[in-house]
Curated annotation (Swiss-Prot):
This is Cathepsin L-like. One of its GO terms (molecular function) is cysteine-type endopeptidase activity. InterPro entries: Papain-like_cys_pep_sf (IPR038765), Pept_asp_AS (IPR025661), Pept_cys_AS (IPR000169), Peptidase_C1A (IPR013128), Peptidase_C1A_C (IPR000668), Peptidase_C1A_papain-like (IPR039417), Prot_inhib_I29 (IPR013201). One of its GO terms (biological process) is proteolysis. It comes from Brugia pahangi. Keywords: Disulfide bond, Hydrolase, Protease, Signal, Thiol protease, Zymogen. Its EC number is 3.4.22.15. PANTHER family: CYSTEINE PROTEASE FAMILY C1-RELATED (PTHR12411). It catalyses: Specificity close to that of papain. As compared to cathepsin B, cathepsin L exhibits higher activity toward protein substrates, but has little activity on Z-Arg-Arg-NHMec, and no peptidyl-dipeptidase activity. SUPFAM superfamilies: Cysteine proteinases.
């Protein structure tokens, strides 16, 4: 596809050619349509109409070698134009399906981000077909966000004193028998201990959703009742303990809050996706804990033991890679992860016949993300994406 700059240059050159031929009025009409399409941001129509108009003029030049004929010759292969038409159709379908609305300038900006992400997902999926990676990707409702906008959702904020090598101990590290034989696979969803996947939206409240989900499973094991607990309660009411509302927080801090005050049900303290004044009352608190245990940072065997014997465990992972943002299926494995920045819930583990060991991880980006809201992350791959570096569970 010719760029705006290239088309403009051809227009200027063609102007001289038209002027010599005494066809200045015809060129004005061509450039008028060019201007209109440019202002509307319709690149496909711009290129197509501009070329068609020049072709109409060029056909009457009796085979003369002109700038117009040169332009027409260079643009005979319209494969890139077809690709642009395909992109614009996909983009229109995308924004329509999600009910997104942008003015023309913003629309072009967002479509460029969408295109970049589409190309990235296509590259990964090609590698999957070639057997080079163990997961697939697909565009989702995050496909038109800048990296900065997306990172707002990654709300795990580790305390400054946290040492991912295990030198810090805010609670007692989980103790377990390393020689104990554990089940080959565990999935707490099949035991009725996991509530449906929810969507945190644009608030950096992943820590609140992960903590609430862990407390739901804990309460189910203690009482036999599975309740939907309130992440909003945690977002609003743990700031005095050091969390930062929609700007992020830390799961153990939320567990400490639950042990002191209790957590309300979602129906009594519904999620709104923004920070509000704490509206906690003793009368609506339904679930408490007795503190929490942490996994020795980096110890995946300890994490496996805790998931098998104690229940779902909140984990901090590196979720900033675009490959993770658009994960769809398979066993996610990434060799170049950053520090933990996103809180999720490990609800089980297993082994894929082709791709090896994995963790079953519940996310809070809605069911359209990943495999119905879940990601299967590589296990026993050197603590991949720090999955065992900031893990804890209620007791």
């Amino acid at each position: 596809m010719w760029t705006i700059a290239q088309l403009a240059v051809f227009a200027i050159l063609a102007l001289a050619d038209f002027a010599v031929a005494g066809e200045i009025e015809q060129l004005k009409e061509v450039l008028g349509k060019f201007n209109k399409d440019y202002k509307q941001g319709n690149m496909t129509r711009l290129a197509s109409d501009f070329r068609s108009a020049l072709k109409e003029y060029g056909d009457g030049q009796q085979g003369e070698s002109t700038v117009v004929q040169e332009f027409l010759k260079k643009t005979e292969d319209n494969g890139e134009q077809r690709a642009m038409e395909k992109l614009e159709t996909e983009w229109k379908d995308y924004v329509t399906a999600l009910g997104k609305h942008y003015d023309q300038k913003e629309n072009n900006f967002r479509m460029a981000i969408f295109e970049s992400n589409e190309l990235m997902t296509e590259r990964i999926n090609k590698k999957y077909e070639q057997g080079l990676v163990s997961y697939t990707t697909a565009l989702n409702d995050l496909a038109d966000l800048t990296d900065e906008e997306f990172m707002v959702r990654n709300g795990l904020r580790l305390p400054n004193q946290t040492d991912l090598r295990g030198k810090r101990q805010t609670s007692e590290f989980y103790r377990y028998d390393k020689s104990e034989r554990l089940p080959d696979q565990v999935d707490w969803r099949t035991k009725g201990a996991v509530t449906p996947v929810r969507n945190q939206g644009e608030c950096g409240s992943c820590y609140a959703f992960a903590t609430a989900a862990a407390l739901e499973a804990y309460h189910k094991q203690m009482t036999g009742r599975l309740l939907d607990l309130s992440p909003q309660n945690i977002v609003d009411c743990t700031r005095n303990l050091g969390n930062n509302g929609c700007s992020g927080g830390y799961m153990p801090t939320a567990f400490q809050y639950a042990s002191r005050y209790g957590i309300a049900m979602e129906s009594r303290y519904p999620y709104v996706g923004t920070e509000q004044r704490c509206r906690w009352q003793q009368s609506i608190a339904v679930v408490t804990d007795n503190g929490f245990n942490e996994i020795q940072p980096g110890d995946e065997l300890a994490l496996k033991h805790a998931v098998a014997k104690r229940g779902p465990v909140v984990v901090g992972i590196s979720g900033s890679k675009r490959s993770f943002r658009f994960y769809k299926d398979g066993v996610y494995s990434e060799g170049n992860c950053g520090r933990p920045d996103h809180a999720v819930l490990a609800v089980g583990y297993g082994t894929h016949p082709s791709y090896g060991d994995y963790w079953i991880v519940k996310n809070s980006w809605g069911t359209d993300w990943g495999k119905d809201g879940y990601v299967y992350m590589a296990r026993n791959r050197g603590n991949m994406c720090h999955i065992a570096s900031a893990a804890s569970f209620p007791i």
